[in-house]
């Protein structure tokens, strides 16, 4: 069995908005398979540069394209509650008509990402980030696979969490 190679591009989420839209539409016209935005509170190289927020951009940009797959590269788990992240991904999946790609990551160490200090996000140890990542993946998988989910982990707990509508893709 062979799989086709796909090509995508990570784009800048810097304003102005219309330039971001034009870039995504041009990428789609060029025939690339996916387009991504980084999920950080600020630009990693220069926090003073303007930057729009990834999960607000994704549904807006998905509505401005028709074929290309869309996603965040990657969503760092310290920035979001896993149930809300699953709901955000589900919403983008519907707005994009099934073109959502969910990229997840443990998050960089706070010393490498000014987002933590600037937004008051706790900088977990590497071991804790990895352990939390495992729980987040399990939770999101459960939520997107079942109409009702419960989870009792070391870091996260869900009680009869309902997830409707169902994702368009799986």
Which positions does each model-derived feature cover?
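Alpha-helix-loop-beta-strand connector modules within alpha/beta enzyme cores
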Residues: 48-72, 132-139, 143
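Short, flexible loop/turn segments with low-complexity composition
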Residues: 149-157
């Amino acid at each position: 069995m062979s799989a086709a190679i796909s090509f995508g591009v990570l784009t800048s989420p810097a304003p102005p908005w219309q330039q971001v839209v034009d870039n995504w539409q041009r990428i789609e016209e060029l025939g690339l398979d996916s387009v991504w935005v980084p999920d950080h509170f600020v630009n990693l190289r220069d926090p003073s540069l303007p930057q729009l927020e990834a999960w607000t951009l994704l549904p807006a940009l998905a509505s401005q394209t028709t074929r290309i797959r869309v996603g965040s590269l990657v969503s760092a788990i310290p920035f979001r509650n896993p149930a809300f992240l699953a709901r955000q991904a589900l919403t983008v999946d519907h707005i994009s008509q099934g073109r959502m790609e969910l990229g997840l990551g443990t998050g960089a160490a706070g010393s490498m990402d000014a987002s933590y200090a600037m937004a008051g996000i706790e900088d977990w140890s590497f071991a804790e980030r990895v352990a939390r990542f495992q729980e987040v993946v399990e939770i999101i998988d459960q939520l997107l696979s079942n109409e009702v989910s419960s989870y009792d982990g070391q870091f996260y707990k869900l009680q009869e969490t309902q997830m409707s509508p169902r994702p368009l893709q799986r």
